[in-house]
Amino acid sequence: MTNICIVGAGGRMGRTLIEAIQQAEGLDLTVATERAGSSLIGADAGELAGVGRLGVAISEDPAAQVAAFDVLIDFTRPEGTLAHLEICRKAGRAMVIGTTGFTEAQKQTIREAAKEIPVVFAPNMSVGVNLCLKLLDLAARVLGDEVDIEVIEAHHRHKVDAPSGTALRMGEVVAEALGRDLAQCAVYGREGHTGERERKTIGFETIRAGDIVGEHTVMFAGIGERVEITHKASSRMTFAKGAVRAAAWLKGRSAGLYDMQDVLDLR
């Protein structure tokens, strides 16, 4: 049995993760936390997630309960995630990171910690999205520099980072396949008199509206035809199930930085 800690347990993703753990075999929710001062402290995690009483009370500090879990799953905010990462590093616990919006310096902190503990770090835990990453690599290599490439993503009104981590990862995969540096070729949004499109750029467009769970399309547009690879998520459960699968996969792994391509054996 793999014991799991969910941080941010009272949020939309946290509750879905609790539900996903209850549906999975070989996993047990033993710790669930919320930010200090939250009105949810003391509530039963199962009742909060709508899966019935589990006997796991929402608490404040995962550091005080490291002996009770093997893997910590985090879909919170970058600053909080790094604090939880340090807790896991000191205690020798594995971690699944689904948080997005990290700076390059923060990503380096994750890479350094992964030299000591096993970490799955992926902007999207969905099996479908990770299959799309493989398809994008293939499409980019086949279509090459003959097409214009655009990444369009849409999420709910509450998402705070843009473009999404998934959109950026899709752009990275395409850029790497074409031998480009995304930092040098990315164009984020367009406004005013932009002039003719520069060849070999990768464009990003962002939509924030309503309750859209997550939609991503990468367009390879040539003359006379275009190819579009699209993923649409209709429920957060697809991300939660992927994260839970990653947590189960991590148990017993050696220290290292992994992603969902590793978990799904898509390398």
UniProtKB/Swiss-Prot annotation:
CDD domains: DHDPR_N (cd02274). SUPFAM superfamilies: Glyceraldehyde-3-phosphate dehydrogenase-like, C-terminal domain, NAD(P)-binding Rossmann-fold domains. Its EC number is 1.17.1.8. (S)-2,3,4,5-tetrahydrodipicolinate binds at H156, G165, T166. One of its GO terms (biological process) is lysine biosynthetic process via diaminopimelate. NAD(+) binds at G8, A9, G10, G11, R12, M13, E34, G98, T99, T100, A122, P123, N124, M125. GO terms for cellular component: cytosol. InterPro entries: DapB_C, DapB_N, DapB_N_CS, DHDPR_bac, NAD(P)-bd_dom_sf. Gene3D superfamilies: Dihydrodipicolinate Reductase, domain 2, NAD(P)-binding Rossmann-like Domain. It catalyses: (S)-2,3,4,5-tetrahydrodipicolinate + NAD(+) + H2O = (2S,4S)-4-hydroxy-2,3,4,5-tetrahydrodipicolinate + NADH + H(+); (S)-2,3,4,5-tetrahydrodipicolinate + NADP(+) + H2O = (2S,4S)-4-hydroxy-2,3,4,5-tetrahydrodipicolinate + NADPH + H(+). It is found in: Cytoplasm. Belongs to the DapB family. Catalyzes the conversion of 4-hydroxy-tetrahydrodipicolinate (HTPA) to tetrahydrodipicolinate. This is 4-hydroxy-tetrahydrodipicolinate reductase. It comes from Thioalkalivibrio sulfidiphilus (strain HL-EbGR7).
